[in-house]
Amino acid sequence: MELTILHLYPDTMSLYGEYANIAVLRRHLEAMGVTVNLVKVTSEDVPDFTNADLIYMGAGTEGTQKAVLLGLTHHVQALREALDRGCLLLFTGNAMETLGRSVTDAQGQVWGGLGLGGFRRQAGQAADVLNLLGIQ
């Protein structure tokens, strides 16, 4: 079995050393006999979700989160198409917030989200603990 993991923005969305999450995931998959192809997409690249089986994005600062959100807005249709064909998303920390309808920052400015989930997020709001977010 072969699995392609697309690591989105490891250069900017790596607040807590997200490379280690990917390394552990890869090691466990390979121990199970899975061949892992890791594709890193930096903020300088145009993301291509065509062959991705899993898309991973880690947490970033509030500023990098907004920059990434603005960049991904241009690729939301391609991201939807990847989800429609069965690609999985694993977004940690504030990266998950980008998937909702909006993110309101500490100054009250509302940023449009990618709209893949029906939730909204506000700075200072108690974090929801989710085991799984199923996006339909």
Functional labels for PLM-detected ranges:
Residues 1-84, 122:
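N-terminal beta1-alpha1 cap of cysteine-dependent amidohydrolase-like domains
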Residues 62-133:
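Cysteine-nucleophile active-site neighborhood
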Residues 136:
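Conserved anion/nucleotide-ligand pocket segment
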